[in-house]
């Protein structure tokens, strides 16, 4: 019995360690670390790459994509930066913004369907901002070539609007640039009803000699966003190299010492991802390209994911056409899956961090999404998905609780052995093993079903944590955002007392419900005789209550509901096996005064 309990204690402690690590993301030191990092970066002085003298804003074919369009620190406001450049408006059902004609850059994108808070009157999410602002974030596609080509479009090229006055779902726009040798570069930009921009480039060579050039693309972000130090989700650089290639994930800190270069391949994509939003470029899929992730220092530190293609040649009097894609928006699962199929983008669904248990996590989301679409409430979808998972694992749970019932049935004999052998632990263990053998009981049989359920638990946890569908999704009553902590607090009587409480005392209704259900679940079993184990057994629900209070309400509701189902499941199975349910007896035992042993 003691060995079996030790397994459960080990599992519980492992979960505590994991959750304690996640809990650190609420620590105010995160902001201090961010400020310290910005100060460190601002002190570094490194000369940044500039366009070659005499060449229209490109570089040589052997050069790398541009690192930055300016050495100056970003001081302009977003409105000022937008107002001082020529632009073409973007207006769709999903996106508002504009294209900067300097560099044909996408640096002004706001997401109409998402607000900063649950209040619909709050500002909509700003994804992209111009490079000369503090939060500059943009994508850009251009060319690099030898100077004799006559110049190619790059970061400082001012394109001309040839057709269309506004980019919408039904009206593309065409930009053109003609260099000093008469080579014509044209770019037609179209957009779907969501977040995918299609770029069709054409290069016409009317001259008497062939020209050679390469293409580049980059996603550049000023500074480093504040990222909670949790292992649950990846935020930073990511990409797939090759049509059947593997995913590359790099954190911002991974590239601060030196750039990370991915081997040249044909096909794939690259970009930068946040928890809910992403910016990604899909280069032309027929030409090999090299991918690089880097940190650019100087007065304006920035992080960049870029690619550079192999050199391509356009003969005299000929032309070439290239097609690229830019994704800039919300990581909606059905939409990302559709883009992977519709545009043949390899492994584009990995834009969403499904984790190690992809084969469990994604089907779990599809089930939850089915319930969400049917009932229209993501909280209800969480509850129903948990029921289905519990039902699927009922046979395993039955074995687990049957083993526990058998152990309870053996409890009187165990007590007799304990009284017989006293403090002789070696003799006690030998007698226990003999008893297990006689009763044909495996003391660890109840642990394996639990261990098999752990990946499913983490998969469900992952779905709830990472998917944008839970963001600002209401439940019932006071829960208006399942992705935010329960806003109530026990320490001001859930809002009845007119004062705010410190963050660490924000113990809301749902964390309390979770703590109570966890307490009841643990009291379905007798308190361990070992004092240390008994103390852990007693305090764990309280510790979890405080820890999970700062977690998204959707996760806490899931945990409370899962505990409730587990209690019902355990009671049913133990009753079927003739084991006494000692929940209330165990609770009463907490308050009994233990007799003082005479010396």
UniProtKB/Swiss-Prot annotation:
Keywords: Cell inner membrane, Cell membrane, Chaperone, Membrane, Protein transport, Transmembrane, Transmembrane helix, Transport. It is a multi-pass membrane protein. NCBIfam families: PRK01318.1-4 (NF002353), yidC_nterm (TIGR03593), yidC_oxa1_cterm (TIGR03592). Required for the insertion and/or proper folding and/or complex formation of integral membrane proteins into the membrane. Involved in integration of membrane proteins that insert both dependently and independently of the Sec translocase complex, as well as at least some lipoproteins. Aids folding of multispanning membrane proteins. GO terms for cellular component: plasma membrane. Gene3D superfamilies: 2.70.98.90. Interacts with the Sec translocase complex via SecD. Specifically interacts with transmembrane segments of nascent integral membrane proteins during membrane integration. InterPro entries: Membr_insert_YidC, Membr_insert_YidC_N, YidC/ALB3/OXA1/COX18, YidC/Oxa/ALB_C, YidC_ALB_C, YidC_periplasmic_sf. CDD domains: 5TM_YidC_Alb3, EcYidC-like_peri. PANTHER family: CYTOCHROME C OXIDASE ASSEMBLY PROTEIN COX18, MITOCHONDRIAL, OXA1. This is Membrane protein insertase YidC. The lineage of its organism: Bacteria, Pseudomonadati, Pseudomonadota, Alphaproteobacteria, Hyphomicrobiales. Belongs to the OXA1/ALB3/YidC family. Type 1 subfamily. The chain crosses the membrane at residues 6-26, 378-398, 448-468, 501-521, 536-556. It is found in: Cell inner membrane. Residues 35-78 are annotated as: Disordered. One of its GO terms (molecular function) is membrane insertase activity. Residues 41-76 have a biased composition (Low complexity). The keyword Protein transport applies. GO terms for biological process: protein insertion into membrane; protein transport. Coiled coil: none annotated.
